[in-house]
Amino acid sequence: MALSQGLFTFKDVAIEFSQEEWECLDPAQRALYRDVMLENYRNLLSLDEDNIPPEDDISVGFTSKGLSPKENNKEELYHLVILERKESHGINNFDLKEVWENMPKFDSLWDYDVKNYKGMPLTCNKNLTHRKDQQHNKSSIHFSLKQSVSIRDSAHQYFIHDKPFIRNLLKLKNNIRYAGNKYVKCFENKIGLSLQAQLAELQRFQTGEKMYECNPVEKSINSSSVSPLPPCVKNICNKYRKILKYPLLHTQYGRTHIREKSYKCNDCGKAFSKSSNLTNHQRIHSGQRPYKCNECGKAFNQCSNLTRHQRVHTGEKPYQCNICGKVCSQNSNLASHQRMHTGEKPYKCNECGKAFIQRSHLWGHERIHTGEKPYKCNECDKAFAERSSLTQHKRIHTGEKPYICNECGKAFKQCSHLTRHQNIHPGEKPHKCNVCGRAFIQSSSLVEHQRIHTGEKPYKCNKCDKAFIKRSHLWGHQRTHTGEKPYKCTECGKAFTERSNLTQHKKIHTGEKPYKCTECGKAFTQFANLTRHQKIHIEKKHCKHNIHGNALFQSSNLGDHQKSYNREKHIKYNETKIKYSSCT
C-alpha cells in the first residue's frame, strides 16, 4: 500500500481508543499503548515540527482513557514510560548523549530484554524515506508515517523483538545535530555497530524488503500493515561455529575475520585490528606497566596478566583436570596439561618436524634453527634463546635460591635441581623404571633415567657431534669449545665450566662432607665418592673367590688375595720369558 509523502501533524500519528476499547486492554497492552504514543511524540519532537502539542496533552489523553490520577502527572508519566523503556529496551533516553553515558549498562539490559521479552500483538505500517546519503538537516528529512496499534484478537501478529533499540536509531540519528559527532563515534565504537548500517537495515524492514521471514502465530488480516520484523533464529559463524543471537550481528561479526589491521605500531611496524591491542603492544616498547599488584608491588603491562599473577598470592586454582584432578591457576595451563593425557602435540616445527605440547616450547625450539637469542643478561651481556634460561642465569649473579627442599631445608636455584635432590630422601616415588626398578618422584626424571638403558642421546653437539643424555650435559660440554667458565669461586677466584664442579670445589673451603655412609658413618664431599665406597658394603660378605679354590669371607681379604695372585702371575710370566730367551 503506497503512502503519501509529506509533512504531518501529531494527529496523524495519534492512536485513539474508545472508553470501551480501553477497558478491554490488559496492563501490558496499556503499557504498550503509552510506549508507542510517547515514541511517536518524541519522533516528531526531534524533527522540530510546529504542530506538536505539549506533553501535558498526551497526559490528558491518558486520563481520558481511565488512567489513575498518579499517571496523570506529567513528571510521573514521563518517568513511568521512560524508565519502563529503559528497563525493557536498554535505552535511558532518546537523547544520544544520555544513551552514550549509560552505555555500561547497555549490554546487560539488552540480554535481559531478549530473554524476558514476550510476544506482543502489533500491527504497524511505517514507511521511511530518509536515505543515508542525505544531509542531516531538517529540510531533507521527510517521513510518511502512520502508525496504528490494534490489540484485537482477530487481527494481530506475534513477533520476537530481536533488536529492542532498532526503532530508536532513527531518533538517535536525528539528534546528531544536538549531540555532536563525537558522541556518535563513541556510540558506534562502544556497541561495535554502525548507525548508518543499522538505519539502512531498518529502512529495509519498514519498506517491506523481506530480509527475514516472518514467523506468525496467527496471521494478520491486514497483512500489508505488518512490518517484516526479524524472527529469533540462530546465526552461526561459519569459521568458528559461534552462535550469534542477533541476525544483524552475524554480518558484523563476520567482518572480524577479514578486518583490516589498520592500527600500526610506529616502532616495529606490527599491525592490529583493534586500537586496544595496539595500546597493549606499545607498552612493550615503552616499558610502561600501569597494573600493579597490591601485595608485592610487581607491575604488569596488561590487566589480565595482573589477574593471573594475583592467584599466586591467593592460591586460587579454579581450573581442574577431569582426568587426574590436578588444579591449575590458568585455563591455558590446564589445556597444556590435558595434552599430556591425550598425547596431542599440535605445535610442529617446520624445519625438523618436531612437535610440542605448548606454543612457547615451539618458539624456543625454533631459535635453535635460527640462532636467535633475544634474552640478554644486563650483568654479563650473555644472551639466551629462552626467557626461562635467562631467569635461571640471573640467579648466578643474585645468589637467589627459591626452590627449597621440605625434608632438609636445602635450597636450589632451579626446580630441576630440587627434583633431583628429592630423590635422595625416602618417600613416595610413583614413577618406577621397568628395567632396574629405580623409582623417581617425577616422570621427567624417569624419562632421563631410561635413556641410560636405551642408549638414547638426543642432545648433540654442533661442533664435534658428541651426544648426551641430558641437555645440561650438552651445555657443559659446549663450554669446552668456547672456553667459557661462568661459575667462579668467591673464595679463591677459581672458575669452572659447570656448576656442579664449583659446588664440589666449595666444599674444600667449607670442609663440608654431606654424603654419609649409612653402614659405617664415613662421610664424603662428593656423591660419586660415596657411591664408590658403598660398593665395599654391597659386596656379599660370604662371597667366594675361586681363583685357587680359596674361600674368602671378607672383602679386605679378597683384595689382598687378588694382589698376591696378580704378583704370582707376573713372576711366572717373567720366568717363562727368561727360559724362552735362553733357548734361542
Curated annotation (Swiss-Prot):
Keywords, comma-separated and alphabetical: DNA-binding, Metal-binding, Nucleus, Repeat, Transcription, Transcription regulation, Zinc, Zinc-finger
GO CC aspect terms: nucleus
A Pfam family assignment: KRAB
GO biological process terms on file = regulation of transcription by RNA polymerase II
Cited Gene3D superfamilies? 6.10.140.140, Classic Zinc Finger (3.30.160.60)
SUPFAM superfamilies (alphabetical): beta-beta-alpha zinc fingers (SSF57667), KRAB domain (Kruppel-associated box) (SSF109640)
ZnF locations on chain (C2H2-type)? 263-285, 291-313, 319-341, 347-369, 375-397, 403-425, 431-453, 459-481, 487-509, 515-537
This molecule's function is given as: May be involved in transcriptional regulation.
Protein family according to the UniProt entry = Belongs to the krueppel C2H2-type zinc-finger protein family.
- This chain belongs to the protein called Zinc finger protein 677
